[in-house]
Amino acid sequence: MTSIIGAALPYKSPEKAIASSSYSAENDSSPVDAVIFAGTSLVLGTACRYLFNGTRVPYTVVLLVIGIFLGSLEYGTKHNLGKLGHGIRIWNGINPDLLLAVFLPVLLFESSFSMDVHQIKRCMGQMVLLAGPGVLISTFCLGALIKLTFPYNWDWKTSLLLGGLLGATDPVAVVALLKELGASKKMTTLIDGESLMNDGVSVVVFQLFFKMVMGHNSDWGSIIKFLVQNSFGAVGIGLAFGIASVFWLKFIFNDTVAQITVTLSASYFAYYTAQEWAGVSGILTVMILGMFFAAFARTAFKGDSHQSLHHFWEMAAYIANTLVFMLSGVIIAESVLSGQTISYKGNSWSFLFLLYLYVQLSRCVVVGVLYPLLCRSGYGLDWKESIILTWSGLRGAVSLSLALSVKQSSGNSYLSSDTGTRFLFLTGGIVFLTLVVNGSTTQLLLHLLRMDTLTATKKRILEYTKFEMMKTALKAFENLGDDEELGSADWPTVIRHISSLKDLEGRQVNPHDGYEAGSLDPTNIMDIRIRFLNGVQAAYWEMLDDGRITQCTANVLMQSVDEALDLVSTSSLSDWRGLEPRVHFPNYYKFLQSKIIPHKLVTHLIVERLESACYISSAFLRAHRIARQQLHIFLGNSNIASTVINESEVEGEEAKQFLEDVRDSFPQVLSVLKTRQVTHYVLNHLNGYIKNLEKVGLLEGKEVSHLHDVVQSDLKKLLRHPPSLKLPNVDDLITSNPLLKDRSSFRSLAIGETDA
């Protein structure tokens, strides 16, 4: 990490750290033993994931406890763990900077890339409040309480250093639980986004106070300069890497491995460039990079590539979290068992529990002070959500790594060894207590606040879906129950093995009961609108995979659905409202009247805008038609379904009229667009046909590879050189263009250019 004057923090190198561990070459240890600890951690992590699945105990809490148990066996008993113990000591001796550089880029990029862009934009104000003023309030609250009540005779700088160190939150357990329980997106986005931001801010605050503790005097000017450079420098580097990576992805066609490699390498290079070369916050840099990818590169990954990308990052984050929390447990055990100052002097255990109370109190102060502003920004915040937000302030790997750096940098006139040991002990204890107490009781708190209960509408949807599942099961039994070779199956035995359908057997239930009586209930209508818009968005994704729309068009369409989802409680379907400006010419097109602009450029801009409008309108109509069909199949002719379907049909009138105008004025535009879509569809169909021939064994690998390359080459040519529209006469183009509402000025432009 880089200080405010550009010097590196005095961390020990990995070689020195390992050499200072209590093991040596005499114990027959080998660097390869580090692999044993990593492998054992993953095996134990997999077992815990299976055994504790469906329980109230978060996965990360179990890993932390196991890590403490292994560390206690290795450091607290005469009988060490052999090769596994050697591996534990190697990992425990790794430089904290190296730990952050290895694990943080993966965890930060996965979290920021997986967040919903629209949710981020709406919650950004709340996230900045909690990560900016919130971290400062927490730092000074904790620092003041530590200075005034702890008996360690620390000065204000040292007390504030510990306060800033404990500012970094890591709500992995809480966020995973909220997602599992189906909590609102805004809540998970706010907690996750705040964690990402305040990790970066906390590290910057930590660096600032660390340099002060180490004797570097800084005036207010240098402090402000340092904070500004770290913040804006991180944003700039993150955006630069994001733009370069997205630009690179445009040249990679249907190569999932290469695409994933670009995202992985970009996250590590961005972190290293920011942290080591530019001296700014690597955490903020990777967070900005991930959000940029989420905003502009999500549609670059289609079909299998999209799934493979998310599966890769989920797996990478799972492995990183497993290793981080196992190692955190080992570090906590070692800090408690190997420090005589902790074990025998100062009543440090009682002060640890007191510090835990201070951490919770400071979190309450942060949320309480900022509550009026949090309620008025983004999606707002009610009192129940504020309680969960307060309780979700868990501490994790970042705080622990910073405490390790303090311990390794201690032992001098500025920072005593006892202080470094106490920092690690107190931080490790807070990490353990927040994970075990807060993490394990979050589900109970959600239950007490009744935030985990399903609404009446959702319950009816579940009951109806189970009823439809029974019908689907009966159809499947009719198709497969009687086999030519084996004979018939026993339906009662089949149904006994399908526990989800046992309660429905024999019940004559109209699946639409409950909707008629409550069809005018705003909550019911809002719920169905949300499901309808989710169906529209799913149709857009399918059209993107099929080549019916471009990446740029897909981004516009997805954004319109996100904006409409925010308004479902107060108005009817409104996703066309967000697309309407894209279908008409914006005001800045009036500058096309200038004779300075070349004739061909004017024609190209107008045709490009016209094609984009046709793509948007046709995709909108198709997606709504698909969603209406799905909703009708799902809810039948119920009043509530008819209400939402009517809203959809009303929305589509303007899009239909626009395409009719284009068909009358420039039918060749629609013909070219349809030709592109059909060509892309045929090539995709051929690709699927080749895969199917391989699947049934009619083609061998070499033959499949040859045919696949030929089809992929054609697809690449289609995307780079699609069928183009023969440019019409500029006078006809402008005067007949259905996009133009005021055509007189464009007519004069056209006539002027024609005369010229």
Swiss-Prot record:
Belongs to the monovalent cation:proton antiporter 1 (CPA1) transporter (TC 2.A.36) family. Signal peptide: none annotated. This is Sodium/hydrogen exchanger 8. GO terms for molecular function: sodium:proton antiporter activity. Residues 1-31, 78-89, 147-157, 216-225, 272-276, 333-350, 407-422 are extracellular. GO terms for cellular component: plasma membrane. May act in low affinity electroneutral exchange of protons for cations such as Na(+) or K(+) across membranes. May also exchange Li(+) and Cs(+) with a lower affinity. Glycans are attached at residue 27. The gene is NHX8. Disulfide bonds: none annotated. The chain crosses the membrane at residues 32-52, 57-77, 90-110, 126-146, 158-178, 195-215, 226-248, 252-271, 277-297, 312-332, 351-371, 386-406, 423-443. Keywords: Antiport, Cell membrane, Glycoprotein, Ion transport, Membrane, Potassium, Potassium transport, Sodium, Sodium transport, Transmembrane, Transmembrane helix, Transport.
